[in-house]
Each structure stands twice: as C-alpha cells, then as structure tokens.
A protein has these predicted regions:
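N-terminal secretory/targeting leader peptides
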Residues: 1-17, 25-26, 30-237
Length: 237
C-alpha cells in the first residue's frame, strides 16, 4: 500500500501533502492496513520535497533529455526519470558525490539537505524546484510488541510518537531554510523555480501504470486528488 507514496506528483502542493498526512483518522486506516503483515506505522515524518539537482541548469523537462540522474531504487522513480527523457541510474546514496564529481552521472534528486549534509552542493550547482515527489518517512512498530503493551503503556507510546512527529516537522522547516542559505552563500548553488505543470504532464503514463498494477492504491490516489484540488494554484504550481 505504501508504494503509492512513490508516485510522481501524487501530491501537487505541500499544503495538500500536509493536510493528508495530518488527517489522523484517514492515515490510521492506511497504517492499520498492514496489520496482517505484522507491522503498523505509528506516525510519519517530513522528508521534504524531492527535486532534481545537477551540474547543468534544468529549467524544463526537455533539459533532462540524455542526462544520467541518480534516483532511488524504486520502479516509480526509474519510470519517472525515463519519462523525462533522462537515464535513471540507481546507486547507493553514498556514491552520488563521487559519481557526479567524476562525471559518471550528471545529477541526482533529493531535498535541499542533500546539498549540505552530503556536500552535493560542491559538485552540483543547480537545484531545480520541480517538486516531483513528497515521500514521508514512517515510524514502524512491530505489531506483536504493540499488542503486548498495557493500555497505559500503549497510550504513552502513541503520545510519544505524536509528539515526535510535531517536533520533527518543526525542525525540518528550520533545517531546510538553513541548508538553502548555506548552499547559496557558501557553495554557490543556484535555486531555480520551474514550470511544475510541464513536469507533471510528462508522468501521466507513469501514474496510470502504477494504478493499474496496484489495486489498493486507487482509493488512496482518489482521496489525495480531492485534497489536491483544494490547493490548485497555490504553492507555486
């Protein structure tokens, strides 16, 4: 069920992303859907918006043609990259710096923190806000462990998870702001606002393929599209 969150442009704005993920009643239905597999997500953490960054400027999908881009080892990410005309190069994240530096790849995709925490801003000077994915991190709990807790212990455990979500989301915004400042002022990275809709149009086929192969994803997709519509025209799209 969680594969749906790898779909490019599942969320079309950060406002929609946060509204869906903060809808506790709705998300608990998704979290509990894996009970039969013996685990359950307890809460989510913001991992930001994934964007392309490279050694050359990317202003439109056409600029990606022929580029070699490191993506996550997920079918949706590989298919997305190919839809833009680029060559997807799945590899360990720890190899990205050297691969860009040596010209093995032209760029990668991630949030702003990759530029500073992993020093990718030293070798990739252009960061384009195409906002192709918003994939949450999840806190996973073993169901046997959770069911073994007393009522009071369970209450405390879930409250701690809730508080950790609130604090992480606050700190995330602070860290992104700081990373962008460091990347611009100390690394010389150029941040580029692009026509997000132009990128969205290129991956319609990828979205349709994901929905076709995953029946569980369709209701979640439909729900998120309703929320997306509430924020059309906002958040830079």
């Amino acid at each position: 069920v969680y594969e749906i969150f790898s779909m490019p442009y599942l969320f079309t704005s950060e406002d929609a992303y946060h509204e869906v993920m903060n809808d506790t009643d709705y998300m608990n239905k998704i979290f509990s859907s894996t009970d039969e597999q013996g685990f359950r997500a307890l809460t989510w953490y913001n991992a930001g918006t994934r964007n392309f960054y490279a050694k050359k400027e990317i202003d439109s999908p056409e600029d990606m043609k022929g580029l070699k881009i490191r993506v996550q080892q997920r079918p949706a990410s590989v298919a997305m990259c190919q839809a833009f005309g680029a060559a997807a190069s799945p590899m360990s994240f720890g190899e990205v710096y050297t691969a860009i530096q040596q010209g093995v790849i032209d760029g990668a995709e991630n949030n702003e923190l990759a530029l500073t925490s992993n020093k990718h801003g030293e070798v990739a000077k252009y960061f384009s806000y195409n906002k192709h994915q918003m994939i949450p991190d999840l806190l996973i709990g073993n169901l046997s462990f959770l069911n073994g807790l007393s009522k009071e212990e369970r209450k405390v455990f879930y409250k701690a998870a809730e508080l950790s979500n609130e604090e992480e989301c606050k700190q995330w915004d602070v860290q992104v702001k700081e990373a962008k400042k460091v990347a611009q002022e100390q690394m010389g990275v150029k941040f580029i606002d692009v026509d997000v809709l132009a990128f969205q149009k290129k991956v319609k086929g990828v979205q349709e393929s994901i929905l076709k192969d995953n029946a569980q994803a369709k209701p979640i997709y439909d729900h998120i599209q309703k929320v997306n519509k509430k924020y059309e025209g906002k958040d830079g799209e």
